[in-house]
């Protein structure tokens, strides 16, 4: 089958990019590809059998027209000016059978005009982390970019030490970022901001294109998508680590996996980025930061969208987030109906977990085994303060009895939203260390496991992390 590519970005937004081709690595070789995703995109298997090829920037497919995008943004709350694709190149936009498109973005593809002081490269460590994280999030049901392939090489890339150079093929319906809009707003080119908005509406919100109120309705949906995404992050214990405005997806996708982390111990103020000295991007601050970022996006639209309309959309953010978060947390607790004591029970559990430094994922998964008429719980042994747990657990069982549903039905619901497996940093690190020695077995094995996060397991993927694996510090270097 011949793949079809279109050039919408190149044709319609000529001032938002520089056209250039990838710079290949030395002795590049394909070490992993996403068979399931490739099948979904109708990519012929033969493309993965001819060396690094397009996956390593050595060749382009017919119809591809590579370019690096320019955007700007706020980083850690401070205006950073022009940024852009410093090591990534958009190879093309694949046209799918249903008429939608999928960006092929090659990360680590070499120097671009937006590399600033960087070398345009990515290291094997960071490409493995992003491939694992994006696929883990996808199978958890959270909107995200996807990973299609990883190429490693003999090219050394220098970070804290010399590391193997690598490339990741990332795919997404769009790489539109808040930072694209900021770039032209701060250059006082509001008409180009409007052109970006029109491009987004035309291709991703086409049902609004002929509506006289299209900009307000579109921005309201961007707010809602962002609120929903952040709510989902919070329910699975995901910390992004670097929520700069240039890392915010207009479509509400999880974008740019750098120093991310999933909670091990329940620690509301968890900071996964060792460069985040003030805790701006801590786990519990993510909802507030996302709203701040939306406010920056709204500012760029203010020359042609009424401020009252923008503020009305922003004012809806908290309620949308709380609604999505509340619905999912009630499911995690096994509540079928909504009762007034639900929030108090959840907050009491969180307080207990924080005091005891309980494992976030294991706690909710083990809670899924609760039988409402039994005082016994496998979770009890996870707590030192048994009296405090017993008191909470008695109230929790009483609440369960208000819903007329069998234990088996409720347990099935809970186990469908409380994963047994999340991508803990130590699991990724183990796969990385093996891969850097040339052994890809664990990389493939872990990818396979992450496809079934809600299935029961009895291996170390779902055990408590080892002491060395807790609070692994991760930097932005990639």
Curated annotation (Swiss-Prot):
Belongs to the SELO family. It comes from Shigella sonnei (strain Ss046). The keyword Transmembrane helix does not apply. Signal peptide: none annotated. It comes from the Bacteria. It catalyses: L-seryl-[protein] + ATP = 3-O-(5'-adenylyl)-L-seryl-[protein] + diphosphate; L-threonyl-[protein] + ATP = 3-O-(5'-adenylyl)-L-threonyl-[protein] + diphosphate; L-tyrosyl-[protein] + ATP = O-(5'-adenylyl)-L-tyrosyl-[protein] + diphosphate; L-histidyl-[protein] + UTP = N(tele)-(5'-uridylyl)-L-histidyl-[protein] + diphosphate. Mg(2+) binds at residues 247, 256. Its EC number is 2.7.7.-, 2.7.7.108. ATP binds at residues 84, 86-87, 107, 119-120, 170, 177, 256. The active site is at 246 (proton acceptor). HAMAP family: YdiU_SelO. This is Protein nucleotidyltransferase YdiU. GO terms for molecular function: AMPylase activity; ATP binding; magnesium ion binding. Pfam families: SelO (PF02696). InterPro entries: adnlytase_SelO (IPR054838), SelO (IPR003846). Nucleotidyltransferase involved in the post-translational modification of proteins. It can catalyze the addition of adenosine monophosphate (AMP) or uridine monophosphate (UMP) to a protein, resulting in modifications known as AMPylation and UMPylation. The keyword Cytoplasm does not apply. Keywords: ATP-binding, Magnesium, Manganese, Metal-binding, Nucleotide-binding, Nucleotidyltransferase, Transferase. Its cofactor is Mg(2+); Mn(2+).
